[in-house]
Amino acid sequence: MDRMAGSFGSGERARKITDEPQLVERPEHPAIIELAAYLERLRGDREMPDRADIQPSEIARLLPNMIIAEAVNGGADFRIRLFGTALVTLLGEERTGKLLSEFAEESSAFSSENPEFVQRRWLFVTQRAFFGRKPVFLKVPFAASGRLYMVGHCLSAPLTAGGSEPAQTIGAMFASRVD
């Protein structure tokens, strides 16, 4: 994985991420496993699932932790169409309607790192799924006062929008406490 400095973003509850996120081959969190299986089922024999195939009622319990982003300028940036309420609580800000390139400015109030790192981190993960045309799984460590207290388990996957080319990404983050 390319080394990316900084953090995904932080808020009142998630002050700082201390280490680089780790790309993982397979998801470990039960909810990420469930979402990945759902998307794989929707994909069928196609390269990627289509946005129209998603039935929110089938994944209702996952929605608070989900994000849907629409590609802008061929994937140079992404506009957030859904930013779940659990993500708002975790990261300390509402991001629905914003571009990923706008995350940095807003996250600067919550992060001691260069705010541009926030933008680059989100773009890196989203573009990796979008241009790679397959799901990306990762783990993100969170720490406060130099102590690891939580791990974010994440998924980002491409979606088509009626065609065969990716047009959006769908993802989720679920946090688990570290004992």
Q: Where are the predicted features?
A:
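Sensory/regulatory domains in signal-transduction proteins
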Residues: 2-9, 15-38, 42-179
